Amino acid sequence: EVPSRGLGDVYKRQIKGTKVGCNAGDCGSCTILMDNNPFCSCLLTLGKIKNKKIETIEGVSEDKQFILLKKSFSIHGAAQCGICTPGIIMSALALLRKNKFPKKEEVEFALSGVLCRCTGYQKIINAVMNVNKITENKNTSSNNMKEVGKRIERIDGEKKLDGTEIFGDDFSPENS
């Protein structure tokens, strides 16, 4: 029975960064990378991932491209509520590993499997398209806070961008 258990269910119970929304492959919030290609983890069974390289948002925390992607999302104000953000980040990471300077249409296609109810996607698209134009050490928040009308980084942005923001569905009773 173990091979038929859903990967999304395993992640939902054991790690909190990969968010499981619809559990039907429609929303994309549970997107992970399998052999560097985005997949909805809720549609994958444990039997389908044997001998595959699986990456979750937690597993890419040291990846330089991921670090730059988080910074670009923060600069562009691309993270809103945070439920879809890990899935969007993982889809964008797969694209950027193949193409460091994607065209808008390529970004739109790469992100088309993840639904976001909070944004019009433009900030997200801009963040992905501009990720390799920023530097890892660029500190925008301290500079922007000195100017009226400039964007400041969200105080809760880091948790939304790395998947550590905890939502109601992420809680489990002790010893469950």
What are the language-model segments listed below?
Residues 22, 44, 54, 171-176:
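A broadly structural signal marking compact, well-ordered functional cores
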Residues 29-60, 86-110, 121-137:
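Iron-sulfur (Fe-S) cluster-binding segments and ferredoxin-like electron-carrier domains
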